[in-house]
Amino acid sequence: GKLIAALGDDVATPAGCTELTANTEDAAHEKHVPVVETERDGHVIRARVGSVEHPSLPEHYIEWIALEAEGRLEVHYLEPGMKPATFFAGGSKTGTVYAYCNLHGLWSATF
């Protein structure tokens, strides 16, 4: 399906849409919660999905990984067969990384 992202407070869910809440599915947290690391004095953020690597098969994979920080949202799309990891530039000191599993929904980690 389609996803709509709303940044900021007091944003209403559009009619006909369902609001996703991160980390609420009954699935293995160690394979879904993003792990965030910074590199090069904090100027690069590395995000990977799971402390145990998530599968990347056509029937079960991470569709995208996103960084929400400093009022912006950057989304990196993945396909089956790709490692569930990516890099973000910018050096944000705080933020939230989201990952979307095609079977188990939305997951997040704040740093």
Summary of predicted features, one role per range:
Residues G8-T21:
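Cysteine-rich micro-motifs
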Residues T21-H32:
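Proline/serine/threonine-rich low-complexity linkers at boundaries of modular beta-sandwich domains
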Residues R46-V49, P84-G91:
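Exposed aromatic-hydrophobic patches
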Residues V49-L57:
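Short amphipathic, basic-aromatic surface patches that mediate peripheral association
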Residues Y61-G71:
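Extended low-complexity, serine/threonine- and proline-enriched intrinsically disordered segments
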Residues A69-Y77, W107:
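Surface-exposed loop/edge segments in extracytoplasmic proteins
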Residues K93-L103:
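Short, aromatic- and glycine-rich surface loops/edge beta-strands on solvent-exposed regions
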Residues N102-T110:
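Short acidic/polar inter-strand loop motif in beta-rich domains
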